[in-house]
Amino acid sequence: FLPIASLLGKYL
């Protein structure tokens, strides 16, 4: 999956 999704997961 995209690395951006990982960052969003941390914030959400």
From Swiss-Prot:
As annotated in Swiss-Prot or TrEMBL, what is the tissue specificity of this protein?
A: Expressed by the skin glands.
Superkingdom of the source species: Eukaryota
GO process terms (BP): defense response to bacterium
Q: What are the record's GO terms for cellular component?
A: extracellular region
Task: Answer yes or no on keyword Secreted.
Answer: yes
Keyword annotations of the record? Amphibian defense peptide, Antibiotic, Antimicrobial, Secreted
**Where found in the cell?**
Secreted
The UniProt function text for this chain reads: May act as an antimicrobial peptide. Show low antibacterial activity against Gram-positive bacterium S.aureus (MIC>200 uM). Shows no detectable hemolytic activity towards human erythrocytes.
Which protein family is it in? Belongs to the frog skin active peptide (FSAP) family. Temporin subfamily.
The protein's name is Ranatuerin-5
Q: What high-level taxonomic lineage is stated for the organism?
A: Eukaryota, Metazoa, Chordata, Craniata, Vertebrata
